[in-house]
């Protein structure tokens, strides 16, 4: 044997170089073939990589253990001969564990393990591979060839679980080498293994008798079709073996096996054709049942006759009660049916099993031609019941379906006027209520209903209500400190107002942004109403007015944060010069979540903020493809060009910006239905009229400038793709793409 030679080569160093992969293979193999030591397996594992091929070789006997050869004692020889005589016809049958697909009605002995039966007891390892694909077998009977002992092997059907079949196999089915005439010498090698196996089997049988007593008495009086002549042997003394996995599977099939000789293959073939006919019958009967059920849908209260063999009558009535009653009746009747059939079969053993197989699952029929004992016959009809049950509920439900849409439509109609009412109420409340109270109601409407008719309205939609109180205090302080360009008023602003603004901003932040943190789609910010950047706009605006530190928000303000805010921020932090070069601003600590407020790690918000371009967050100025072209360039303007400082605007204008905000808000509140007195009385003190004039003039001037800038940008940028030099993120033309 070449394996012997190889063994002597490898064995010396094999133990040293067992890498974990080999070791795991060897472990699984030793579990499958306990009588192989790891030394025996090492060579095979080294020679063949694939576990399946190794198992194949061992089970087919192409590879054997290097073992002592003993001559069989006379007694053993005599026993074997007797056995072989009694079993001669069975050589035409497959040893179920040997033939992978159970197909061979032809000579499957070409690779039965019995030639090298040192490995014979684990042929089922082969099964283990194939259990997932059970075939419709040409030979349905699996006959287990054990010395005079009946070990029912487990039929592999689609309904038994893979684990169940395998575990049953590996634990119990130990095919003995009974069906080879010619290999007596080789058989002698495995006698020790056989004796061990037989002892094991006896122990296991004793353990399992407790489990199987129930099945036993059902099996006793049912010798199966082919055992007409040898009914003297029943399987009562050897109950079916089941592993825990088999017991756990939903329908343990206790299928009785006989080991009596089958006279010829022709008989088998006849049986198989019978069974195919039965399949067709059962299918046809199921179809009839379905047809009847559909007709029963039209005449609901009449009774249809749905049953496997059209014997039972299940009255159909509306409602869910029908289903339950029908299920119960069917189960009861089927149990009675199967019991009757089994009695009939016991009377005439030779009768073919058509009646039972009609009720059985088709899978079971093709897999095993043996009678099901009672408990199987009871469990098998369940799938068919299940197939009928879904059809039964359809009958009462169908007439109801047309009603359901009507019901759905009715509630919808009242809802719509309700919504309109709510909107009207909200609109009526706006002029009446104080702004702090109106804030929440107006939020949604501000986003979607207000037009940007004025340049600053675009940026200040919601701010007008929410920050009014702050701005009032701010304006009041401006009057106390008449020098309009001083930075003190803002930094001295009362902490209370700062707190209010922060609360509002936080509330709004959570209201919109956190719902769908990473969600974006390309045109998302096209509509002015979309509340994405507005949150930051408020946050930063708040900071710009309440404290001087808003410079930090210069590049982190989200998309809506526009020039006016940052201009004010630059002014208040006395950083106008510094902020003119973006690099200093990056160095500021980040106080907001980096990518536009809702952190999405992938591609840095590919659509919203396309990472390298818009907001270089990380303080390295030279790293990005181009630098920020403008001082307060914010990537994604949700509002059309608000107050973008064109390069020629000086710091003087920046300083005026900060004041301009209040006046603009006050002016815009009038068209939006905010009563004028409320605006003019800020905390009980009237607005300085001179201030208001100043604001108005500047507002007009800046609007002109901006229209010009926007027109230029639109002309220049028409059709230029995204990353290029003059790209103006404030202009509407460029907005949808990136």
Swiss-Prot record:
Keywords: Chromosome, Cytoplasm, DNA damage, DNA repair, DNA-binding, Nucleus, Phosphoprotein, Telomere, Ubl conjugation, Ubl conjugation pathway. One of its GO terms (biological process) is protein ubiquitination. Ubiquitinated at Lys-281 or Lys-288, and at Lys-328 or Lys-329. in a manner dependent on RSP5; ubiquitination accelerates its proteolytic processing by the proteasome. Residues 298-324, 337-358 have a biased composition (Acidic residues). GO terms for molecular function: DNA binding; transcription factor TFIIH holo complex binding; ubiquitin binding. Residues 103-121, 224-237, 380-455, 467-498, 660-688 have a biased composition (Low complexity). One of its GO terms (cellular component) is chromatin. Transmembrane segments: none annotated. Residues 69-84, 211-220, 256-291, 325-336 have a biased composition (Basic and acidic residues). It is found in: Cytoplasm; Nucleus; Chromosome, Telomere. Residues 69-455, 467-503, 640-688 are annotated as: Disordered. The modification Phosphoserine is found at residues 260, 273, 307, 646. Residues 21-63 form the CUE domain. InterPro entries: CUE, DEF1_CUE. Residues 500-530 are annotated as: Contains the proteolytic activation cleavage site. The modification Phosphothreonine is found at residue 338. The C-terminal part appears to promote nuclear export. Belongs to the DEF1 family. Homodimer; may form higher order oligomers. Interacts with the large RNA polymerase II subunit RPO21; the interaction is direct and serves to bridge RPO21 to the Elongin complex in a manner dependent on transcription stress. Interacts with RAD26. Interacts (via CUE domain) with the Elongin complex subunit ELA1 (via C-terminus); the interaction is direct. Recruits the ubiquitination machinery to RNA polymerase II for polyubiquitination, removal and degradation, when the transcription-coupled repair (TCR) factor RAD26 fails to efficiently displace stalled RNA polymerase II. Also involved in telomere length regulation. Binds DNA. Present with 3380 molecules/cell in log phase SD medium. This is RNA polymerase II degradation factor 1. It comes from Saccharomyces cerevisiae (strain ATCC 204508 / S288c). The lineage of its organism: Eukaryota, Fungi, Dikarya, Ascomycota, Saccharomycotina.
């Amino acid at each position: 044997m070449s394996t012997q030679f190889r063994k002597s080569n490898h064995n010396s160093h094999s133990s040293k170089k067992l890498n974990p992969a080999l070791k795991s293979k060897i472990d699984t193999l030793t579990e499958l073939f306990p009588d192989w030591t790891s030394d025996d397996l090492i060579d095979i594992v080294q020679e063949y990589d694939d576990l399946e091929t190794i198992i194949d070789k061992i089970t087919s006997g192409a590879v054997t253990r290097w073992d002592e050869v003993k001559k069989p004692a006379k007694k053993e020889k005599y026993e074997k001969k007797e056995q072989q005589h009694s079993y001669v016809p069975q050589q035409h049958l497959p040893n179920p564990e040997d033939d992978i697909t159970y197909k061979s009605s032809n000579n499957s002995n070409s690779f039965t393990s019995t030639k090298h039966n040192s490995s014979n007891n684990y042929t089922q390892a082969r099964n283990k591979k194939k259990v997932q694909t059970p075939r419709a077998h040409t030979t349905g009977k699996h006959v287990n060839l054990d010395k005079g002992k009946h070990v029912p092997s487990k039929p592999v059907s689609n309904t038994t679980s893979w684990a169940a079949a395998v575990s049953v196999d590996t634990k119990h089915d130990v095919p003995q080498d009974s069906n080879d005439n010619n290999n007596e010498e080789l058989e002698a090698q495995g006698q020790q293994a056989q004796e061990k196996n037989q002892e094991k089997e006896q122990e296991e049988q004793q353990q399992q008798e407790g489990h199987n007593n129930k099945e036993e008495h059902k099996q006793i009086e049912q010798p199966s079709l082919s055992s007409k002549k040898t009914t003297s042997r029943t399987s009562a003394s050897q109950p079916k073996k089941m592993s825990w996995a088999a017991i756990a599977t939903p329908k343990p099939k206790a299928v009785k096996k006989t080991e009596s000789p089958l006279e010829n293959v022709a008989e088998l073939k006849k049986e198989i054709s019978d069974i195919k006919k039965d399949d067709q019958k059962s299918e046809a009967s199921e179809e009839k049942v379905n047809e009847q059920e559909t007709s029963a849908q039209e005449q609901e209260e009449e009774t249809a006759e749905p049953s496997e063999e059209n014997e039972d009558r299940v009255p159909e009535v509306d409602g869910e009660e029908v289903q339950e009653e029908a299920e119960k009746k069917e189960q009861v009747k089927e149990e009675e049916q199967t019991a009757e059939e089994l009695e009939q079969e016991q009377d005439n053993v030779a009768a073919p099993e058509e009646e039972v197989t009609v009720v059985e699952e088709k899978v079971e029929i093709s897999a095993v031609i043996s009678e099901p004992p009672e408990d199987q016959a009871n469990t098998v009809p369940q799938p068919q019941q299940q197939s009928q049950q879904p059809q039964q509920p359809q009958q009462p439900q169908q007439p109801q379906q047309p009603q359901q849409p009507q019901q759905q439509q009715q509630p919808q109609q009242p809802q719509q006027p309700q919504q309109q009412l709510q909107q009207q109420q909200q609109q009526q409340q706006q002029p009446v209520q104080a702004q702090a109270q109106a804030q929440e109601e107006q939020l949604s409407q501000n986003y979607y209903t207000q037009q940007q008719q004025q340049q600053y309205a675009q940026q200040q939609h919601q701010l007008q209500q929410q920050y009014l109180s702050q701005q009032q205090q701010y304006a009041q302080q401006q009057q106390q400190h008449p020098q309009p360009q001083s930075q003190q008023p803002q930094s001295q602003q009362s902490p209370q107002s700062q707190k209010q603004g922060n609360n509002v901003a936080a509330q709004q932040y959570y209201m919109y942004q956190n719902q769908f943190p990473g969600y974006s789609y390309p045109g998302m910010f096209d509509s002015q109403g979309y509340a994405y950047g507005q949150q930051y706009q408020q946050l930063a605006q708040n900071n710009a007015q309440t404290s001087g530190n808003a410079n930090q928000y210069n590049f982190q303000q989200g998309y809506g944060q526009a020039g006016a805010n940052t201009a004010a921020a630059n002014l208040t932090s006395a950083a106008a010069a510094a902020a003119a070069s973006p690099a200093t601003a990056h160095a500021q600590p980040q106080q907001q979540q980096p990518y536009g407020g809702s952190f999405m790690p992938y591609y840095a918000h590919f659509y919203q903020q396309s990472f390298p371009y818009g907001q270089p967050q990380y303080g390295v100025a030279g790293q990005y493809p181009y630098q920020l072209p403008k001082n307060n360039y914010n990537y994604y303007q949700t509002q059309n060009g608000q107050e973008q400082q064109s390069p020629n605007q000086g710091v003087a204008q920046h300083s005026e910006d900060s004041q301009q905000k209040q006046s603009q808000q006050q002016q815009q509140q009038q068209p939006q239905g905010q009563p004028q007195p409320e605006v003019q009385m800020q905390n009980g003190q009237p607005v300085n009229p001179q201030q208001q004039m100043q604001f108005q003039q500047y507002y007009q001037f800046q609007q002109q400038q901006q229209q010009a800038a926007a027109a230029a940008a639109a002309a220049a940028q028409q059709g230029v793709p995204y990353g290029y030099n003059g790209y103006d993120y404030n202009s509407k033309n460029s907005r949808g793409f990136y």
